[in-house]
Amino acid sequence: MQWSMTNRMQSFASVFPQLAFVLAAELRATGRADLARELEACIVKTVRFDSEANIGSVALEPPQKLNSVERNIVGQKLGQVITFSRPRYASLQLDNFGRLIGVELVAPPPRLGSALRLTSRNRWGA
């Protein structure tokens, strides 16, 4: 299932406040306060959750937009994945420009899994 925020732009921190807090705290503790601020400001594009596999993903729109050369000539690709010792179930995906583009959640805790499941069922905008 997928949830899209076409007409209703909300930050990651407002859609998933507890998860944003935990991930941002971990980023700050490891010297990545820049990414913590970016995570809190990113706009949620889509939320997906596969109940059978117990895997979720949140696609993010970073605050910093690509310029025309980056977008049309270089192109956006997956650049880096940041994993955490706590929480182990979450990882961040950065593009080849170092911008945050997604959060992957493998076997999240039951409450977060429920929130992902519910959020992925919503249809906001057209």
Which residues are covered by each model-predicted region?
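Intrinsically disordered terminal and processing segments
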Residues: 2-91, 96-97, 103, 107-126
